[in-house]
């Protein structure tokens, strides 16, 4: 049985997030009409140089791929929800 390794980050419900688990990442962006709430699917990946968010689906459910360091984005636990 594979051991689950946790990232040390909690989601909006206080649950620890395992590495590689899909998350609903709420991203707040500025649009023409003001603030827009986008929901992207991301995973947390472990890297020697620091953990990253790996985004795998955009707000329309289309496949995408881009990464950001956890420390380079303005986010909080309320922006993350573990997808079951």
Which residues does each predicted region cover?
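Secondary-structure transition motif
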Residues: 1-84
């Amino acid at each position: 049985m594979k051991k689950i390794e946790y990232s040390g980050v909690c989601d909006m419900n206080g649950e620890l997030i395992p590495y590689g688990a899909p998350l609903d990442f709420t991203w707040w962006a500025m649009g023409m009409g003001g603030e827009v709430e986008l929901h992207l699917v991301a995973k947390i990946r472990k890297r020697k140089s620091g953990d990253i968010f790996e985004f795998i689906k955009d707000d329309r459910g289309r496949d995408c791929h881009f990464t950001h360091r956890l420390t380079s984005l303005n986010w909080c636990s309320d922006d993350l929800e573990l997808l079951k």
